[in-house]
Amino acid sequence: MQPEGAEKGKSFKQRLVLKSSLAKETLSEFLGTFILIVLGCGCVAQAILSRGRFGGVITINVGFSMAVAMAIYVAGGVSGGHINPAVSLAMCLFGRMKWFKLPFYVGAQFLGAFVGAATVFGIYYDGLMSFAGGKLLIVGENATAHIFATYPAPYLSLANAFADQVVATMILLIIVFAIFDSRNLGAPRGLEPIAIGLLIIVIASSLGLNSGCAMNPARDLSPRLFTALAGWGFEVFRAGNNFWWIPVVGPLVGAVIGGLIYVLVIEIHHPEPDSVFKTEQSEDKPEKYELSVIM
């Protein structure tokens, strides 16, 4: 017989446990996206505020990519660790996730990114205030707005910027589909987040020059909104010839195109697995971690 205190503790724990699968998945997406932004934008903040002494392009590319991997490790077993509205949209379109979940996933992702940006702002508040004499600037050598959101290179047109985001996210989704395709080479179970992190390093290193390679509406729009409210002002939405919508719409289009390409060029041509193979797959890989459910 357990002590009375232990029984009370157990009852309290039981009261905390969520019964709704959707609620669990929503919280998972919130936490995963929060971690992505804190670690990812934290890498950018360290590089910018130290004026390159404690980071640069390499640390930002690697750090942000590993932030994605760590976020997927946190959320992957519960919600799949989409941490990206573009990914969630593609999964619904291609039957990997039910449509009614989409607004919950997307809302959690945007909220997690906003809270993550606020956390980075709080951690580096003194550094931000001393960096440009207390000014929060969007352009110039003392600009700090790009710690939180992406901005285009001076030469970049809106048409080129849109194509940039479509293509980058298209490639992201093609390879993510491949990583989780059990009938392709795939990745060893448990190493999928690392594979995705390496993928983002490659994309950021090859396609990041134009505008920073956001590929994620929540990662860009929520921190941008935070900066508008935190002191940079709503000029963050007008900067770059009203660039703000490009990292929102471009990834959504690119994700759909990328998923469609993989399905049409690779997935539908796989031979149907026999019943033994199906049984082995169901035993080796729980449904919650399959591409059809999480990615």
From Swiss-Prot:
Enzymatic reactions: glycerol(in) = glycerol(out); H2O(in) = H2O(out); urea(in) = urea(out); (S)-lactate(in) = (S)-lactate(out)
Principal location class: membrane
Entry-linked CDD domains: MIP
Side of membrane Extracellular, spans: 44-57, 124-160, 208-210, 226-243
UniProt KW keywords: Cell membrane, Membrane, Repeat, Transmembrane, Transmembrane helix, Transport
UniProt xrefs under InterPro entries: Aquaporin-like, Aquaporin_9, MIP, MIP/Aquaporin, MIP_CS
Biological processes, Gene Ontology terms: amine transport; cellular response to cAMP; detoxification of arsenic-containing substance; glycerol transmembrane transport; purine nucleobase transport; pyrimidine nucleobase transport; urea transmembrane transport; water transport
Gene3D superfamilies tied to this protein: Glycerol uptake facilitator protein
Extent of motif NPA 1: 84-86
Motif (NPA 2): 216-218
UniProt topology in membrane: Multi-pass membrane protein
GO CC terms of this entry: basolateral plasma membrane; intracellular membrane-bounded organelle; plasma membrane
Keyword Transport assigned: yes
Highest taxon of the lineage: Eukaryota
GO molecular function: channel activity; glycerol channel activity; hydrogen peroxide channel activity; purine nucleobase transmembrane transporter activity; pyrimidine nucleobase transmembrane transporter activity; urea channel activity; urea transmembrane transporter activity; water channel activity
Membrane-side (Cytoplasmic) residue stretches: 1-24, 78-79, 93-98, 179-190, 265-295
Transmembrane stretches, start-end: 25-43, 58-77, 99-123, 161-178, 191-207, 244-264
Cellular compartments annotated: Cell membrane; Basolateral cell membrane
Record family assignment: Belongs to the MIP/aquaporin (TC 1.A.8) family.
Function per UniProt: Aquaglyceroporins form homotetrameric transmembrane channels, with each monomer independently mediating glycerol and water transport across the plasma membrane along their osmotic gradient. AQP9 is the primary route for glycerol uptake in hepatocytes, supporting hepatic gluconeogenesis. It exhibits broad specificity and may transport various small, non-charged solutes, including carbamides, polyols, purines, and pyrimidines. AQP9 may also facilitate hepatic urea extrusion.
Domain notes for this protein: Aquaporins contain two tandem repeats each containing three membrane-spanning domains and a pore-forming loop with the signature motif Asn-Pro-Ala (NPA).
Record note on quaternary structure: Homotetramer; each monomer provides an independent glycerol/water pore.
Record protein name field: Aquaporin-9
Protein source organism: Homo sapiens
Upper lineage: Eukaryota, Metazoa, Chordata, Craniata, Vertebrata
Gene name of the record: AQP9
